């Protein structure tokens, strides 16, 4: 792997910057699987909280959900956007920090993007190149692939990217995923999903965006495509961040727009080999970076590219 690429994935964003927690992150376990299990022990996924002590939590592996305070928000994604914010809240709730025996009422409720950001922040602080990735996980529901975020870290000894998913105790629950060294093909990367739907080789309804509205196919994949592109450029945007030119404008996109995204997806299939081309697009294609968010919209952004 080229030094330039690895150096890029040591850099941090607003989201992954450790700040005052750098030394603390470096004190956490160096074994990635052990670290992932520790991080997982600090969080509750909003779906797990909603389902209570059933399904994935039938054995209370994530804790007794009846003990979660009624007055706490049922999902804290909107509040804890950065690794530093999540870490600060964990220390506020339990001054011991990251501990395997954290009580349910002291855990934070965040989803996969946030666990991915936290893992990226910790590994980068340890001087291990790491990147968050967005796509779809086919291992949650039969015949469906759910929008999901994971990580890849550089194993210097083996000279390869290792794909991991620290968002749950999947292996312990018998999923047979190998979640701390996920084999190629077990995760649906956004670029391949986009191209497969575009060329008709895969039924797009397989890919589902978990908004509760049934959003699927290209409408779902276009979101993941930009999540992944931004994450590869060390800008791990959250779910409600989308380029202004596509935000709530899917029906207005032209075939030329789709062809441009086909070209972006082709490059994203091999992000290391196409690193310079992706960086060039990142630095020059304004419409891919001018973002709408919950508070910034068309009023602020239209006409800026």
PLM ranges: what are they?
Residues 2-106:
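Secondary-structure boundary elements
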Residues 97, 117, 140-142:
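Generic structural signal for short, flexible, solvent-exposed coil/loop and linker residues
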Residues 105-133, 151:
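Cysteine-centered nucleophilic/redox motifs
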Residues 3-14, 36, 41-45, 55-72, ...:
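His-Asp-centered catalytic microenvironments across diverse enzyme cores
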Residues 29, 33, 110-113, 117, ...:
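Conserved structured core elements
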């Amino acid at each position: 792997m080229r030094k330039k690429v690895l150096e890029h994935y040591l850099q941090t964003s607003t989201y992954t910057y450790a700040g005052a927690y750098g030394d603390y992150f470096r004190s956490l376990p160096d074994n990635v699987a052990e670290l992932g299990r520790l991080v997982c022990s600090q969080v509750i996924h909003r779906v797990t909280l909603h389902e209570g002590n059933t399904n994935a939590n039938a054995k209370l592996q994530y804790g007794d959900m009846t003990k979660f305070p009624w007055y706490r928000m049922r999902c804290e994604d909107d509040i804890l956007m950065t690794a530093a914010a999540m870490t600060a809240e964990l220390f506020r709730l339990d001054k011991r920090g990251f501990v395997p025996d954290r009580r349910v009422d002291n855990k934070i409720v965040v989803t996969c993007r946030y666990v991915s950001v936290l893992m990226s922040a910790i590994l980068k602080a340890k001087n291990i190149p790491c990147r968050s990735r967005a796509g779809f996980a086919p291992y949650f529901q039969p015949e469906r692939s759910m929008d999901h975020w994971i990580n890849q870290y550089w194993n210097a000894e083996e000279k390869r990217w290792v794909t991991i998913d620290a968002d749950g105790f999947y292996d312990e629950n018998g999923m047979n995923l190998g979640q701390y060294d996920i084999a190629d093909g077990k995760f649906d990367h956004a670029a391949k999903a986009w191209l497969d739907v575009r060329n008709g080789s895969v039924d797009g309804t397989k890919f589902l965006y978990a908004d509760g509205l049934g959003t699927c196919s290209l409408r779902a994949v276009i979101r993941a495509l930009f999540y992944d592109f931004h994450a590869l450029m060390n800008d791990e945007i959250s779910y409600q961040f989308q380029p202004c030119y596509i935000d709530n404008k899917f029906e207005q996109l032209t075939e030329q727009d789709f062809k441009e995204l086909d070209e972006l997806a082709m490059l994203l299939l091999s992000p290391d080999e196409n690193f310079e081309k992706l960086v060039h697009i990142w630095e020059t294609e304004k419409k891919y970076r001018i973002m709408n968010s919950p508070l910034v919209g068309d009023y602020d952004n239209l006409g800026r590219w």
